[in-house]
């Protein structure tokens, strides 16, 4: 199964794609109306527009540094996951998405990095909580949000994960507890982006790591993960042969492969791959 991730509604109807994800809100904060013909996708706690309009929404670390694009390693502005009004707005948007199409994908779920958020609200809620451990409290915040979102989605719920499968890293970084999220999530999506895909050994390592992290066997022909995961590849201006190779590697370990933000290039790769299979060829580097 091949899918597309797009901001352009007409591309969701291309026949080459078995599945389409349509960005209702991306990290810029730009909103679009949900559509019925695709899986609507919401960037949850990445929102440049909201952060720019209301700096009080932005998480801070223990030294008072804000989680914005002005800092190293931050590609967009973040919103604190404990801000009640913002969360309620997100949940309303998720409900609207589910009304158009009963399957929804959540993107950018979690705290921005380790040591976030240390705003007064987070500090007070941690102090008043049942938790003695800061990491466990952060996990509870994110799990509660995903649980609330799942109640508003009658169909399948997809959740995007930061591409780091190593034990404990998702928890330390974002407050993501995979085991706690499994009852609410039907499928995880892992973006493994590169501008060229000139090599794929790293892609295989990460894909296999997520297979293990989600409860699957290390062996490809062993047991599947407890919750399935798919891999999203970056298709913009990537050489078609390289994109095909990356898709074949990803497809070995993941349930499905999705292509991001270049429908024409993704379509070309799918058509080439289908033609090679019909000719009885096995794709490989020449």
Write out the residue ranges for each language-model feature.
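Aromatic-lined carbohydrate-recognition surfaces of secreted/lumenal glycan-active proteins
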Residues: 2-8, 135-175, 218-239, 259-262
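Active-site-proximal loop/short-helix segments
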Residues: 103-133
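An active-site-proximal structural segment forming one wall of the substrate-binding cleft
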Residues: 78-110, 152, 177-181
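Substrate-binding cleft of secreted/luminal carbohydrate-active enzymes
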Residues: 192-199, 221, 227-286
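Catalytic domains of carbohydrate-active enzymes, especially glycoside hydrolases
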Residues: 1-34, 96-103, 181-187, 250-257
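Active-site-adjacent "subsite" loops/lids of carbohydrate-active enzymes
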Residues: 40-95
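The substrate-binding groove and active-site-proximal loops of carbohydrate-active enzymes
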Residues: 19-22, 72-91, 133-140, 191-196, ...
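Substrate-binding cleft/loops of secretory-pathway carbohydrate-active enzymes
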Residues: 15, 156-197, 246-250
């Amino acid at each position: 199964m091949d899918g597309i991730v797009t901001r352009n509604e007409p591309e969701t109807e291309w026949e080459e794609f078995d599945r389409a994800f349509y960005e209702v809100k991306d990290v810029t904060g730009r909103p679009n109306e949900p559509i019925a013909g695709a899986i609507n996708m919401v960037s949850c706690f990445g929102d440049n527009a909201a952060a720019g309009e209301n700096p009080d929404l932005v998480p801070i670390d223990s030294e008072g540094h804000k989680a914005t694009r002005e800092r190293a390693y931050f590609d967009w502005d973040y919103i604190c996951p404990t801000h009640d009004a913002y969360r309620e707005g997100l949940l309303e948007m998720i409900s609207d998405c589910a009304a158009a199409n009963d399957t929804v994908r959540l993107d950018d779920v979690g705290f921005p990095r380790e040591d976030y958020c240390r705003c007064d609200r987070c500090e007070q809620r941690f102090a008043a909580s049942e938790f003695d451990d800061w990491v466990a409290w952060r996990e509870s915040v994110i799990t509660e949000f995903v649980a609330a979102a799942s109640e508003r989605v009658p169909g399948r719920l997809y959740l995007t994960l930061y591409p780091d499968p190593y034990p404990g890293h998702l928890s330390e970084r974002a407050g993501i507890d995979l085991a706690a999220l499994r009852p609410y999530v039907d499928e995880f999506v892992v973006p493994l982006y590169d501008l060229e895909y000139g090599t794929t050994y790293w892609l295989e390592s990460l894909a296999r790591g997520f297979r293990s992290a989600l409860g699957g066997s290390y062996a490809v022909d062993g047991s599947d993960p407890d919750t399935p995961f798919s891999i999203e590849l970056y298709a913009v201006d990537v050489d078609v042969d390289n994109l095909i190779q990356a898709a074949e590697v990803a497809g070995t370990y993941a349930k499905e492969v999705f292509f991001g933000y270049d429908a024409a290039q993704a379509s070309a790769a799918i058509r080439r791959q289908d033609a090679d299979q019909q000719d009885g060829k096995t794709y490989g580097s020449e």
